[in-house]
Amino acid sequence: MRFSQLIAVLKNGDAGVLSTSEGRDPELRGAASLERATADQLSFLEKGNALVGSLESSEAGAVLIPDQQELRELAERLQLAWAVCGDPRLAFAEALEQLHPKPSPQAGIHASAVIADRVQLGAGVSIGARVCIGDDTRIGPRTVIHPGVVIYGNVDIGEGCELHANAVLHPGSRIGDRCVVHSNAVVGSEGFGFVPTAKGWRKMPQTGLVVLEDGVEVGCGSTIDRPSVGETRIGSGTKIDNLVQIGHGVVTGRGCALASQVGIAGGAQLGHGVILAGQVGVANRAVIGDRAIASSKSGIHGEVAAGEVVSGYPAIPNRLWLRCSAAFSKLPEMAKQLRELKKQVSSEATGGSIEADQ
């Protein structure tokens, strides 16, 4: 694809192409970082990026840059094809879709797939090898189901979804449109519900639903449990990384982002646009407000206000946590000073002095 052809596509996208170079139109066969890009590859640079210096040594054939005069002048001096974008990272994402288009599996059903009698398949559905689908399941148009996927009975899947190899959907799973479930993810498994009795733990039947609203993406090896009653609901546009555990009855708002190894206990509620970094733990029935952010390994109990940034265990406001972290390394010296002060106070209380004792 020529650079000019790519820019013509990007101008219709969301990244905002503001201006482009003239007279240079390389053939692009891929994309790479500034350090690794070659003459037939595209790269990009963000505003304030620490890699600004690497642009000068880059061998990229074309580059997407922020609206900074010095970068335009540098790209011109290096004789690079360039485009100024309102959001270079977003433009790069849109460019990757053009340079590396996803293959479209052919519609149809593989001969080795096992499909129950009471299954409704929409137009253009693609079902791969050794897929198993139970009764009372509906699959919307243009959904792609890769090899080894298991879909229990009583599952509803919208249109344009993609289920990757070996994903599992349990009964009561309700999947919206354009959702992606990656390999080995499990949606709708039984929640961790047991009642203590004199004879031991009594299992609580988990009869509820799991609802993934439109545009949800679930990473590899992640699990979303169904509750005993009611539903576990993941808001539209939410992105879930690999190895995330979401307990029974959890509700998230729209557009949340949950990084790897996040664990959310049953009944917790997340507002819209919440971001949980890696290994964040959320306690049972905790409430997190809209647009709140928790940094890596935070432990959340109780309530986090809308827009708040928290860190640490137990989670506290991020700025306070930074001050505490800075003080932590000074604790040994502070303890030593405290011991010396205690000696001094004790000596003065008995009428002596440290100098005299020495």
Curated annotation (Swiss-Prot):
Keywords linked to the UniProt accession: Acyltransferase, Lipid A biosynthesis, Lipid biosynthesis, Lipid metabolism, Repeat, Transferase
Give the enzyme's main class according to its UniProt record, as a single word.
transferase
Q: What pathway is this protein a component of?
A: Bacterial outer membrane biogenesis; LPS lipid A biosynthesis
Catalytic residues identified in the record: H248 (proton acceptor)
- GO MF terms on file? N-acyltransferase activity; structural constituent of carboxysome shell
PROSITE patterns in UniProt: HEXAPEP_TRANSFERASES
This entry carries the following GO cellular component terms, namely: carboxysome; membrane
One Pfam family of this chain? Hexapep
GO biological process annotation, one example? lipid A biosynthetic process
Catalysed reaction, written as an equation: a UDP-3-O-[(3R)-3-hydroxyacyl]-alpha-D-glucosamine + a (3R)-hydroxyacyl-[ACP] = a UDP-2-N,3-O-bis[(3R)-3-hydroxyacyl]-alpha-D-glucosamine + holo-[ACP] + H(+)
Q: What is its EC number?
A: 2.3.1.191
Tell me the subunit arrangement.
Homotrimer.
The record's family statement is:
Belongs to the transferase hexapeptide repeat family. LpxD subfamily.
Entry function = Catalyzes the N-acylation of UDP-3-O-acylglucosamine using 3-hydroxyacyl-ACP as the acyl donor. Is involved in the biosynthesis of lipid A, a phosphorylated glycolipid that anchors the lipopolysaccharide to the outer membrane of the cell.
Protein name (Swiss-Prot/TrEMBL) = UDP-3-O-acylglucosamine N-acyltransferase
